Amino acid sequence: MTDVARIAQAIREAGLSGWLFYNQFHRDEISDLALGVPRAAHNSRPWAYLVPAEGEPTRIVHAIEPGILEHLPGRLVRCTSHDDLFAAIGAAAGPGARLAAQFSTSFPVCSFLDHGTAQLLERLGIALVSSEELIVDCLGTLDAEGEASHRRAALALHAVVHAAWSRIRSAAAGGAAVHEADVQEWIAGLFAEAGLVTDGPVLVAAGAASADPHYEPVDRGRQLLPGDVVQLDLWAREPGERSVFADISWVGVLAPAPTAEQARVFDAVVSAREAAAAAIGAGLADGLSGAEADRKARDLIARRGYAGGLRHRTGHSIGTRVHGYGVNLDSVEFPDHRRLREGSCFSIEPGVYLERFGMRTEVDGIVRGGRLELTGGDRQQRLLDLGGGA
């Protein structure tokens, strides 16, 4: 159920007049998620929902789709024309209103309000402010139910990755040919046994393919060969729209032990992961941002001589979408200067990608009680291998 009171509280804390949700064709996923509008609902006409800092919200709908916001509180206004729609928004906002809306110069993932509509709203005398901070408060943190589902998924993924590597090890010992798609299928089966669902094939990358952070195999993919680095990246959740994802990455070598170069790269990414986690734990009370946490990991990797192997941010928000709408650990791609806060859930996944291979280690963390807690089982401290590495 949509917590309109929580939305209003966030608006007041931001010092704004209100938050304008505006959608058509379900283009604004944030509006749908925040307000609990089902994707199956007809949305061929625009609707607006204005939550004020104080007072009653206003539901503005087209007469042909009057029920799309019926589950929400507030005064109902029905429109049949473009002029009616914007007149109703202007009347609900009031003179000199400062309204949050879904746009951002920093985060394209939050930018759903089109420029033309923004211009029309500004002609009404409305000052528009990015909703990027409000989104974190209302969609980018986990409640107790979401946290519990995330923790269960994280533990299950930990078991799955070890079961998958055990099967890889057994196949190698028996001389069986194994391709990347085989491992993907094994993991899909393990997900089903564990009662997990996901949104696509997991990442399995062998040899030079491990240097591609978002690699996708063609047909059966590459055969796993002796000496290969094998990168596994798994994400899944329990069934249900309110369930929260977990997302982990483990890496191994198809050999009894890694080469010296493989060991150096692995040590760099593990050390970067630990540096980011330590910085978050130490900096939460001072309002540490996602960008600051990212820089800790990046700086360590650069000091180890692998700055040229950096390809992506250190982590992303996690929610009911595997890439959620909370704070990201990012100082480069889309620098995130929003502070990590109570209920923030995110990955910590530094990686180094060279010409012959790449490596990434990924754990998930949640801020609870002012502390960082890493979820799931024990985090990876040594490479998986064909000897005793686990």
Description of each model-found segment:
Residues 1-390:
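Active-site neighborhoods and metal-handling regions in enzymes and metal-associated proteins
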